């Protein structure tokens, strides 16, 4: 195997690894948003039974990121910079999951193209991790404000 072929192969593997990581971060954000919405509803007294909680949680887990973003916006006001990041992640997530390789397939055939794609996916992962941390902070703040007692 030539060095050039091996380099291209390894770089392609790296590209697909970052693509998978971007999808993972997207799913982790969906989970975190579902958690936050359910906690908001618990804090508001909208969940009166464990069965109702489980039912609502299952529904949230089947919602798309867009549905979760719209719903969470009804209950919680994010600072403008966080809302901008949330919208950016939502838009990029949809692009990555639905159109990324359709639109960028030709870039995968060159080293320059693959490097550009890897950098783009790395940036998405960094942005998603930042949003994840912000959502966790808001979730912990709300959790600490409410008094959850085991029954």
Segment roles from a protein language model:
Residues 4, 81-134:
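Charge-enriched, short contiguous segments at helix-coil
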Residues 68-83:
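Short, solvent-exposed, charged loop/turn and helix-capping segments
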Residues 112-113, 149-151:
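C-terminal/domain-terminus segments
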């Amino acid at each position: 195997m030539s060095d050039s072929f091996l380099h291209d192969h390894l770089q392609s593997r790296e590209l697909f690894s970052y693509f998978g990581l971007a999808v993972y971060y997207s799913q982790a954000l969906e989970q975190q948003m579902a958690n936050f919405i359910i906690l908001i509803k618990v804090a508001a007294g909208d969940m009166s039974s464990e069965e109702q909680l489980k039912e609502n949680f299952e529904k949230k887990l089947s919602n798309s990121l867009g549905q979760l973003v719209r719903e969470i916006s009804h209950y919680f006001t994010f600072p403008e910079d966080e809302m901008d990041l949330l919208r950016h992640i939502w838009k990029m997530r949809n692009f990555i999951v639905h159109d990324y390789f359709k639109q960028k397939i030709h870039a995968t055939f060159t080293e320059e193209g693959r490097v550009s794609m890897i950098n783009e996916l790395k940036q998405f992962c960094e942005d998603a991790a930042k949003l994840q941390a912000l959502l966790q902070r808001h979730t912990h703040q709300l959790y600490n404000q409410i008094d959850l007692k085991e029954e």
